[in-house]
């Protein structure tokens, strides 16, 4: 199914769209890890299909911009108990905990570390688009603090590749 077709045809609000897509993933599962923005005139949600029957959605504040250059970017500290601003699948923490791969930071369940992965060499170009987006919104990253530029030493690197940006 198409997320947009389902949401637009069945939901009156962004929150209803989140709840609808979440219920479909609860029931049927998902074979990909998609990240989509669901918005209406009153609120905007960042929805992430994580794995199998697991998903999470965070209500975005009015004063932020979300950059998603073809990468899922789960770097948020989320309060899973804040049902006003965070909706998620029932087993988002219990399933990975029961199966031994739940990750915790400072004693708190870490959605990003549990379901995400570091951006490897294959994702470096998406990361550079993320940095360009930050610059567009006048929130540039600082070289040496947020990233470093390194020479691309791969044998199959094209001459145009030059340097790659690596997240620190």
Predicted regions and their residues:
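Structured, non-membrane catalytic/scaffold regions adjacent to prosthetic-group chemistry
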Residues: 1-68, 164
């Amino acid at each position: 199914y198409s997320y947009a077709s389902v949401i637009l045809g069945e939901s009156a609000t962004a929150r209803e769209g989140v709840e609808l897509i979440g219920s479909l993933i609860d029931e049927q599962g998902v074979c990909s890890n998609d990240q989509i923005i669901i918005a209406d005139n009153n609120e905007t949600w960042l929805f992430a299909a994580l794995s199998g029957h697991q998903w999470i959605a965070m209500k975005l504040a009015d004063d932020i911009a979300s950059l998603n250059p073809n990468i899922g970017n789960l770097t948020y500290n989320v309060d899973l108990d804040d049902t006003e601003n965070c909706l998620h699948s029932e087993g988002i923490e219990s399933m990975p905990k029961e199966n031994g791969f739940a990750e915790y930071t400072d004693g708190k369940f870490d959605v990003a570390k549990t379901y995400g992965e570091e951006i490897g060499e294959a994702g470096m170009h998406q990361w550079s688009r993320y940095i360009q987006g930050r610059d567009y919104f006048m929130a540039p990253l600082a070289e040496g603090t947020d990233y470093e530029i390194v020479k691309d030493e791969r044998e199959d690197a094209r001459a145009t590749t030059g340097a790659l940006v690596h997240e620190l």
